[in-house]
């Protein structure tokens, strides 16, 4: 059975940090493909300014072109309302019934997993491939105590320390500063061509502490 990676996010915008981590996880976890899962309306970002999905999808498509192992899943953007991870994985489980799903996340997301919506069901639907930055320790036993289904379902993968953040990219654009080499050139050109992230609102972080709505 092949392994299929699921990489969820707002991707506002997609940047080289996302791409490098996805490539490392693909190799280390022996994934046949990585599906990038852009969120239409993340439940933990309601009330925050988010770039329209059409632009985020276009940038994602540009960034992934040329890599046959990277693709986009549209299951979240095609349905209305908040996108819960457990619902997304349920739909993907039906669509890819012949593959083993691996939900890709950072160690910060793993730490917050007990607060997510139906965390045990999430762990039942997919393995959890966790990108572990240098010098970070994860208290797995505490997580397993709160999410029993995650026991034996977590795979920790060391990844390079890449200090690129979408919020910083948006801030730099709003301030008229360069984002060269932080995003693929085609994404940089798209941002400039469409005048994205030039307002004060664009400088606000779209990431908030994860809640039970994730």
Swiss-Prot record:
<keyword id="KW-0808">Transferase</keyword>
<comment type="pathway">
    <text>Cofactor biosynthesis; NAD(+) biosynthesis; deamido-NAD(+) from nicotinate D-ribonucleotide: step 1/1.</text>
</comment>
<dbReference type="GO" id="GO:0005524">
    <property type="term" value="F:ATP binding"/>
</dbReference>
<dbReference type="GO" id="GO:0004515">
    <property type="term" value="F:nicotinate-nucleotide adenylyltransferase activity"/>
</dbReference>
<protein>
    <recommendedName>
        <fullName>Probable nicotinate-nucleotide adenylyltransferase</fullName>
        <ecNumber>2.7.7.18</ecNumber>
    </recommendedName>
</protein>
<comment type="similarity">
    <text>Belongs to the NadD family.</text>
</comment>
<keyword id="KW-0547">Nucleotide-binding</keyword>
<dbReference type="Pfam" id="PF01467">
    <property type="entry name" value="CTP_transf_like"/>
</dbReference>
<dbReference type="GO" id="GO:0009435">
    <property type="term" value="P:NAD biosynthetic process"/>
</dbReference>
<dbReference type="InterPro" id="IPR004821">
    <property type="entry name" value="Cyt_trans-like"/>
</dbReference>
<dbReference type="InterPro" id="IPR014729">
    <property type="entry name" value="Rossmann-like_a/b/a_fold"/>
</dbReference>
<keyword id="KW-0520">NAD</keyword>
<comment type="function">
    <text>Catalyzes the reversible adenylation of nicotinate mononucleotide (NaMN) to nicotinic acid adenine dinucleotide (NaAD).</text>
</comment>
<keyword id="KW-0067">ATP-binding</keyword>
<dbReference type="InterPro" id="IPR005248">
    <property type="entry name" value="NadD/NMNAT"/>
</dbReference>
<keyword id="KW-0548">Nucleotidyltransferase</keyword>
<keyword id="KW-0662">Pyridine nucleotide biosynthesis</keyword>
């Amino acid at each position: 059975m092949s392994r299929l990676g699921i990489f969820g996010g707002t991707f506002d915008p997609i940047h080289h940090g996302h791409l490098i981590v996805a490539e490392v996880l693909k190799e280390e976890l022996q994934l046949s493909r990585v599906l990038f899962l852009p969120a239409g309306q993340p439940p933990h970002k309601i009330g925050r300014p988010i770039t329209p999905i059409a632009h985020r999808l276009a940038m994602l498509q540009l960034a992934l072109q040329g890599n046959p192992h990277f693709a986009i899943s549209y299951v979240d953007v095609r349905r209305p309302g908040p996108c819960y991870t457990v619902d997304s994985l349920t739909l993907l489980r039906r669509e890819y019934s012949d593959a083993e799903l691996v939900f890709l996340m950072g160690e910060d997301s793993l730490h917050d997993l007990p607060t997510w919506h139906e965390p045990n069901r999430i762990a039942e639907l997919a393995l959890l491939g966790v990108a572990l930055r240098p010098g970070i320790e994860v208290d797995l036993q505490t997580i397993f105590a709160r999410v029993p289904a995650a026991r034996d379902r977590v795979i920790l993968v060391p990844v390079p320390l890449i200090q690129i953040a979408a919020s910083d990219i948006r801030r730099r654009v709003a301030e008229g500063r360069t984002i060269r080499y932080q995003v693929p050139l085609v994404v940089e050109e798209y941002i400039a061509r469409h005048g994205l992230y030039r307002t004060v609102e664009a400088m606000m972080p779209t990431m908030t502490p994860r809640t039970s709505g994730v």
